[in-house]
A protein has these predicted regions:
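Rossmann-like NAD(P)-binding element
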Residues: 55-89
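Short beta->alpha hinge that forms the Motif I/post-I loop of the SAM-binding pocket
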Residues: 34, 69, 93-95
Length: 180
C-alpha cells in the first residue's frame, strides 16, 4: 500500500481497523471523525498520519476514500459532498447496500461494500488491524470496473476475501441472517 493516501471518514471499529491495517501495510492514512476523542485516540495509536476537519477536505487529500460512517450519515454524505468525485476510489462499509448504491449514483468511482466482520463493542477502542483477517467482504458490482478491481485488491491487502454480490441480494441475505 506504499504510495497510497487513504482517507477514512469515521474512526470507529471498522474505520479504525481499516486505518490500523492500512498504516501497518505502509499507506499514509488521513482520518476524519466528528468526535475529536476518536481522532486523538487513533493518532496516539499510530493509526493516522493526519486528520481532516471535514469530509470535503478529506476527499481533497486522498487517493482512496473509505466512508465508515453510520448508514444515515453515509447516505447524507454521498448525496451532499461533490468532492467525493475527486479520489481515484471511494467505497463505503455500511451494512445495507441498495440505498447506498442509489445515493452514490453521481459518484463516478464509487464501489459499495460491506465487511462481514465486527465485534460486540464499537468505537476506536475496539479497532484491530487483524479484524478482517480471513473474513468475507461483500462488494456490489460497480459501474467503474477498474475502481471495483482496485477495491478488491485493497480488501485482500486488509486481510479479507472479496465476494461480489448484487446490492439487493446482499441486503436480502443480511436481513435473513440477522434474524438467526
Amino acid at each position: 500500500m506504499k504510495g497510497t493516501v487513504l482517507g477514512v471518514a469515521g474512526i470507529g471499529l471498522i474505520g479504525g481497523s481499516i486505518a490500523l491495517r492500512a498504516r501497518a501495510n505502509g499507506a499514509t492514512v488521513i482520518g476524519f471523525d466528528r468526535d475529536p476523542g476518536a481522532l486523538n485516540a487513533a493518532t496516539a495509536a499510530g493509526a493516522l498520519d493526519a486528520t481532516a476537519p471535514d469530509l470535503t477536505a478529506l476527499a481533497e487529500r486522498c487517493t482512496i476514500l473509505a466512508i465508515a460512517l453510520p448508514v444515515d450519515a453515509t447516505l447524507a454524505a454521498l448525496a451532499s459532498t461533490p468532492a467525493l468525485n475527486l479520489p481515484e476510489l471511494v467505497f463505503d462499509v455500511a451494512s445495507v447496500k441498495a440505498p447506498v448504491v442509489h445515493a452514490a449514483r453521481t459518484i463516478e468511482r464509487f464501489v459499495a461494500s460491506h465487511p462481514l466482520a465486527g465485534r460486540e463493542r464499537g468505537g476506536f477502542g475496539a479497532a484491530d488491524a487483524a479484524l478482517f483477517e480471513g473474513r468475507t467482504w461483500a462488494v456490489a458490482p460497480a459501474r467503474d470496473r477498474a475502481a471495483q478491481a482496485r477495491l478488491e485488491r485493497l480488501i485482500g491487502e486488509l486481510g479479507a476475501r472479496p465476494l461480489v454480490v448484487a446490492a439487493d441480494e446482499h441486503d436480502r441475505l443480511v436481513a435473513v441472517s440477522s434474524h438467526l
